[in-house]
Amino acid sequence: MDSAVPLFQMEGISKRYGGVRALEKAELVVTSGSIHAILGENGAGKSTLIKVMAGVVAPDEGRMTLDGREVTFLSPAAANQAGIVCIFQELSLVPDLSVADNIVISDPPKRFGMIDRKAQRRVAEEALARAGAADIHPLALVKDLPLSRRQMVEIAKALARKPRILILDEATSALTAADVSKIFGVLKRLRSEGLALLYISHRMNEIAELADQCTVFRNGRNVASYKAGSKSDNEVVELMIGREYSHIFPAKPAAVPATAAPRLEARKLSWTDRLHDISLTVRAGEVVGLGGLDGQGQRELLLAFFGVLRGLSGEVLIDGKPVAIGSPAKARQDGIGMALIPEDRKTEGLMLPMTVRENLSFAALDRLSKGGIIDRAAEQRLIDDMVGLLAIKTAGLDIPVGALSGGNQQKVVIAKWLMRQPRIILLNDPTRGIDVGTKQELYQLMRKLADAGAAILFYSTDYDELIGCCDRVLVLYDGALKRELVGSEITERALIASALNIHGEESPVGLGASA
């Protein structure tokens, strides 16, 4: 092959879904031995672009070439055979199968017509090692692994297919910092081996560290291509959103007085070996963050408040009164008024085959029904209000919610719960895998809800979010609450030191303490 010929090229690629333009005359050039970042808001066309590349959907027009020869991929298997492998944002693993089973699922090694288990394990071990995840046992069941480790298995599964072009769609969004570092090393090594990598991420620091070339998409078109590092973050964001970029976080109000009545409290809350004597307070009008390294009990704490966990000890109080929240149904009742925005919108927050309308109404059906009959007029008014409030972009309310972009799906999850007018809102890493424009909208919404009197408890793996959004941050370490940071104390340095439990004397934390 002539070295001047790109490894892969897309020219004039267009794709529409009904009346929605997903791609319009899109162009892309991919070269061997490089990492090419694809940037853009959710709904900009990135996902459709890689689905066309990966043989998941067929373009309406345009052409693709591989090694200078025109190609058409009628299925993912055809793209895989040509050496194009995609790791999509939402995991494709089978939870009840082993790691090894998942890694070789598309082409298991066989002997005498039967799966060769010894060869399967060898292939899995080699793929895991290549992915920097040799510590994952190939015989472990995927369902027993935390989300971050499942993502590593997904990457190993892709590498087992020996790709020439590896596409990663938000592949680090569920990873711990240690795993991200490992993956960066793997990707750089793959680049040095001559692989072409397409990297889709909303994390600008990752793009700066990894990418050689960047292409920005907006409204289905590629609006700019440039050498990585040649533009500032603000310039890139302005290209993505098509307008001047202003400060992403809303202004914080004056601190809620420490004497204000608490809305949500925990007293010596414990659960198995994951939570240890947690005591905290969230007042109406506050945005309180949960910090610390990933996996230190933050998610379990949110699930405990929402009535998901069994065998808790300690007390939960609402408006100063002890309550027994034994189920999510009890948590969302009017006297409590709690909502939980889950970490994984696809599996925990939405019913993908059902319509946007059905998903929006689901959490509020008891409020919209009388005698078992839904008040359709009231339902429509509420839905219209939510679609307007969150600026949900959809071709219609009666299309499957799975057809929406990731950012708009997340807006539907949030809108679904806002239809109940919750008094307490728990958010579990709600901006994972969504674009900077949608993030900005969610930050503004969070503050607006707090200003209207909601009490918000917000877990994020992004330190910038904790600094920019929160009035207070409670840092967890090994299931225990180690430090409370307030106002100007909430800095990256303090968050990191507290997360590592190296800050020296612990600040007092507990029933409304202000460290």
Swiss-Prot record:
UniProt GO molecular function: ABC-type D-ribose transporter activity; ATP binding; ATP hydrolysis activity
CDD domains: ABC_Carb_Monos_I, ABC_Carb_Monos_II
Documented EC number(s): 7.5.2.7
Family matches, as SUPFAM superfamilies: P-loop containing nucleoside triphosphate hydrolases
Subcellular location(s) per record: Cell inner membrane
Binding site for ATP: G40, E41, N42, G43, A44, G45, K46, S47
Membrane topology designation: Peripheral membrane protein
Stretches assigned to the ABC transporter domain: 8-244, 256-503
Keyword Transport: yes
Family according to the record: Belongs to the ABC transporter superfamily. Ribose importer (TC 3.A.1.2.1) family.
Primary role: Part of the ABC transporter complex RbsABC involved in ribose import. Responsible for energy coupling to the transport system.
Subunit and partners: The complex is composed of an ATP-binding protein (RbsA), two transmembrane proteins (RbsC) and a solute-binding protein (RbsB).
Protein's name in the database: Ribose import ATP-binding protein RbsA 1
Source species: Mesorhizobium japonicum (strain LMG 29417 / CECT 9101 / MAFF 303099)
Gene giving rise to this polypeptide: rbsA1
